[in-house]
Amino acid sequence: MEENNKLIINSKQSNLLNELKKNLKECERFYFSVAFINFSGLQLLLDTLKELESRDIKGKIITTTYLNFTEPKALEKLQEFENIDLKVFIANKEIGFHTKAYIFENKDNYKIIIGSSN
């Protein structure tokens, strides 16, 4: 089994956005678990997500209401995609949800990005 670890340092050449786009374009399915989704961030991925929808590449996204950072406008936009299964975890004061994981299913392997770009 080939092991290929990589540190994403958010330079001009290698940053989280570019890695997400690259892996989305290469995958057969994708799974995101992210604490927050805002519309401005989602806009950066819209063209790629539309391309995936046209190719019938399925994805699942789970996010949360944790700290009220997720924007309803972003969720509404994601719901327009027929290939994306969107789930929203309703957080409360006792139970938070602050994950940042991106999983890309390929024919022979999975690629996983864990962490934040901030």
Regions found by a protein language model. Give the residues of each.
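PLD/PLD-like phosphodiesterase catalytic module centered on the HKD motif
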Residues: 1-118
